């Protein structure tokens, strides 16, 4: 059994200024979770939502949250393990490709 990968979605309650008419970060989190469970059933993964205004007590998370607040990245920012796979309007295809690099296989 492979180790479940960690997907992180960074964001805030409000939609980013450059992302008007896009889903919120929490909506993106829920959408990603549902899509991944359908694509990779019985293949566990972990997900975490990180509020950029109240990141956990973890240097990496604090650093990324600060970069987002400083407009170095758009949010929602999506990571698979520690690799950024999407920002602003993440593409499922990019998330799937990274998941498959970690051994996940499509439900057929």
Swiss-Prot record:
Q: Any idea what this protein is called?
A: Putative disulfide oxidoreductase YuzD
The disulfide bonds in this chain are 16-19
In terms of superkingdom, the source organism counts as Bacteria
Keywords tagged on the record: Disulfide bond, Redox-active center
Recorded hits in Gene3D superfamilies, A to Z, give:
Hypothetical protein sa0798
- A Pfam match is DUF1462
